[in-house]
Amino acid sequence: MHHSGKGAALVLGIGNILWADEGFGVRAVEALHQAYEFPAEVKLMDGGTQGLYLLPLVQDADILVIFDAIDYGLPAGTLKVVDDHDVPSYLGVKKMSLHQTGFQEVLALSAITGRYPAKVRLIGVQPLDLDTYGGSLTEPVRSQMEPSLAVAIRFLMEQGFPSRRRISGCVPESLCPPSVNLAHYEAGILVGGR
C-alpha cells in the first residue's frame, strides 16, 4: 500500500491509561493499529505521557492526528474534532493531567522552530471518570471509539494516506506492552509478571 500525498503522518494517542477515561487517546491509537493497515509513511504511536520527548516526532510530521480525552465542558462521551492552530488552545482548556501541559509545549516548540505540521487534527472525547486509578474507559467514552477511528481514517484518506482493514487473524504487534493491553488490563491479567 502506498500513498499519493507527500511527507509523513504521525498518529498519536496521548493520555494515561491508569486513570480511567484519561487513557482514551492511547486506547484509540492502539485500536486503530490493531484494526487497520496504513502506508509506511504513517506512524502510529502510543505517546502516553511522554510530553517533550515527542517533539522530534511532531517536528518531522507533515500531518498530525492526536487522540486524547479533553474536558470541553460537554456531556460525557461527546466526540469533538478540532483542527490546525485551534488545537493548542483546546489542549489547554482545562488541564486534566500533566501530559496536556507537556503536549501543548511540544506544539508551541514545533511552531517556534518553524517545524509545525501542515495539518493537525485533534480527535477528543469528553471524559466521565478521571479519578478511578486502575479504572478502564467508561461506557460513554468507549462508545466513541469506533466513531473516533472513522474520523481519523477519513482525515488520513483526505490527506493521501489510505488505510485497509487488517485481515482477520493478522494481528500486528501491539503498540503498548502486553501488560497494559486493554483486554489484559481490564481482566487484571499480569503478563510477564509474577
Give names to the regions the model predicted.
Residues 20, 94, 98, 136-140, ...:
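Short alpha-helix boundary/capping segments
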Residues 103-190:
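Phosphate-binding/catalytic loops
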Residues 33, 59, 86, 101, ...:
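A generic membrane alpha-helix/interface feature
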Residues 4-12, 17-89:
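Nucleotide and nucleotide-moiety/phosphate-recognizing core
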Residues 23, 27, 49, 74, ...:
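Conserved active-site and cofactor/substrate-binding residues in soluble primary-metabolism enzymes
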Residues 69-120:
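Helix-loop-strand module that forms the ligand-binding subsite of alpha/beta enzymes
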Residues 13, 74-77, 93, 125, ...:
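Residue-level signal for pocket-adjacent positions within structured domains
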Residues 1-8, 183-194:
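Active-site and ligand/interface coordination hotspots across diverse enzymes
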